[in-house]
Amino acid sequence: MNNTEHFGKLTERMQAFREEVLDAKPYIDAQRAVLATEAYKENQNQPRVMVRALMLQKILEGMSIYIDDKSLIAGNQATKNKNAPIFPEYTMEFVMNELDLFEKRDGDVFYITEETKEQLREIAPFWENNNLRARGEALLPEEVDVFMETGVFGMEGKLNAGDAHLAVNYQRILSDGLKGYEKRVKELRAALDFTDPESIDKNVFYKAVLTVIEAVRDFAQRYSKLAKELADKETDAKRKEELLQMSKICAKVPYEPANSFREAVQSVWFIQLILQIESNGHSLSYGRFDQYMYPYYMKDINEGKITKEDALELLTCLWIKTLTINKVRSQSHTLSSAGSPMYQNVTIGGQTTDKKDAVNELSFVVLQSVAQTRLTQPNLTVRYHANIDKHFFDECIEVMKLGFGMPALNNDEIIIPSFINWGVKEEDAYNYSAIGCVETAVPGKWGYRCTGMSYINFPRVLLLSLIHI
């Protein structure tokens, strides 16, 4: 038996769905940019945090939605799979400079229609010197410009787009739902003392959080309604039932807590998706997926509500949906980030906070699902340690033999002591996950780009040093 046969094949529809997504031509998508521009224009008097919340609300209310006919999960980033939205609040400079070059680039080719070009030309003037890149460059010393122009170091990705590199607290989202966050925020807001000047900023922040929660809830409800409409027209009995179930689930999560494996998967996907609709950050990672999803998986298995095969198909669908997320970078940025990578990392294995092996039944299912899909997304990372389940580790080796570069291995024996030496609490150190390419972080507790980032061209530094000796 070869390695491919060892892990089994995708179901027929997931194989077809996979091929559809892989074959999809990536287009530049202007819809988000147009909606974001309208939101910024309408709310110029608002504090920035409120502008961002209202922008997300407008996008989630106005963007096109659809449900793929082979998908078990609802939620799309753009008007079509693999389309790349534009985020004008970061910059429009490279977008306008490359408007007629996207289809001619050496790497990361994107297609663009004349209609899209016209839409982008119409909104571009509003963003001139009114974006993240412009403000960032205004803060930099003149010497930095020289070093950037001569290639000593670069920050193209940081100036042109979000960078994320974090894993959110999915365990809490699943157990509390956004409804739990809403309750907490309302309590904090009600307790504000407005004789304290800091309460002004806190109140604005709380208001923004409540706006976002409402927007996310309504976004999921849009899919609930769409799934019901599709179900009413569906003639295939099995698909009709799936759409009705999808409608029911989307009416509930992520606002309400998840109570089943299917609800948990849909809830996680909505949050994973919306964060990238809002911020354009890559390396938005799933965290310790087999740990926070395990209770929902085992509950459904024990109650006979789902089989391992059902869960396997659902996870392969999730990974295919993960591949639909796309991001356009400037041509110069593609020189170091070719292939439109999104670095959405999934971590399995490792240890529990009481130092026991964390491998469970779902760890094997996740591993098998990634082996079956064999995609560039998500990045799969296995946390290795001295007492890891031997059979599980052997299975990891078998996946590596498939030759698509996964899973990566993180060594708990090195990483956990290092975190503790840096002052990270032991329970957090044992709960770390991979984010992005190879970085590590504590899910839900470490924020944006906590690992730092800089591209330094050391040979260029040496060359300049020799010139000036």
Regions flagged by a language model, labelled:
Residues 217, 224, 228-231, 240, ...:
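Heptad-repeat amphipathic alpha-helical coiled-coil interaction surface used
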Residues 2-206, 242-245, 249-467:
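Conserved catalytic cores of very large enzyme subunits
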Residues 207-218:
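Extended non-globular scaffold/tether segments
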